[in-house]
Amino acid sequence: IETPNGKTVELSDEAGAIRIEDEHGNKILLDSSGVTIESASDLNLKSGKDAKVTAGANLDLEAAAQLAVSASASLEVSASGTTTIKGALVQIN
């Protein structure tokens, strides 16, 4: 299905995939490898209450420039194994 403005929804039994794409280059792909969400610009996830990300094995967060983590109340970082903090300069408090 494709609209005149370039929005596409593709259901493929042959490829076993569902692909949704808009004219701005934003894409959602569901296939046997998983779910891929791709944004040509910003990607925002917003929840009116709690949000949770759970991975069965590893979870990687990577930013080309800066990564900021903040909380208005408390923040906890914990691991049952070794915790490593690396940086050219590490400042605590």
Q: Can you describe what each PLM-predicted range is?
A:
Residues 1-93:
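Right-handed beta-helix
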